[in-house]
Amino acid sequence: MTPQTRRERERAERHRLIIDTARELAESQGWDAVTVRRLAERIEYSQPVLYSHFAGKDEIVTAVAEEGIAEMAAWSRAALESAGGEPRAALAAVARSYLDFATARPALYDAMFLMKVNLAFGENASQPLRDAFAVMFAAFSPFAGEHDPETFTEVGWSALHGLATLDRGGRLRPTQRDARLAVLIDQLTR
């Protein structure tokens, strides 16, 4: 192994450590607790070392968000495939997996959709974002009818995001989660 190869490997390992530590800290104490100083202390490197990987907290959150989107896409894809090709069942499974993901990974969900990140959506989207949208599109588009399928998917995804955000914020009755999801699926599949 050449010294350059070793340095590249060590740099990649540090990069991974920064992201993993940010996720762990956010999940245990919230995103306000994630600072470059605290991350440097946790991983036992100086702040300049962290800044050699990321320009600041926003870039770290962006890296975490992109990973989260890839994870959410995998959850949603598994749900879609479990539905056996029946469109309504597929939509219901994807919708439930989305809400479950938001509940199971709150800090990750916040990084993905509620915090300031530098992720391009639309035509310039990264592959994880495209993959996530593709799963949503596969679930929602069969019900678009006369509407543009991509726009219909965006509206459906927005509705799920609203339910997830309000539910996680304690602004909806916890006992009615399944009923709300059933209403949404009924409305979208008319």
Where do the model's predicted regions map?
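Short, structured helix-loop boundary elements
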Residues: 15, 36, 58, 62, ...
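Generic hydrophobic, amphipathic alpha-helix propensity
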Residues: 11-22, 39, 64-68, 72, ...
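Hydrophobic alpha-helical connector segments
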Residues: 63, 77-107, 129-132, 156
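Amphipathic alpha-helical segments used for helix-helix packing
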Residues: 101-120, 165-171
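Amphipathic alpha-helical packing segments from all-alpha helical-bundle domains
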Residues: 70, 77, 101, 113, ...
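Amphipathic C-terminal alpha-helical segment
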Residues: 157-175, 189-190
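N-terminal intrinsically disordered/low-complexity leader segments
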Residues: 1-13
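Helix-turn-helix
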Residues: 17, 25-59, 63
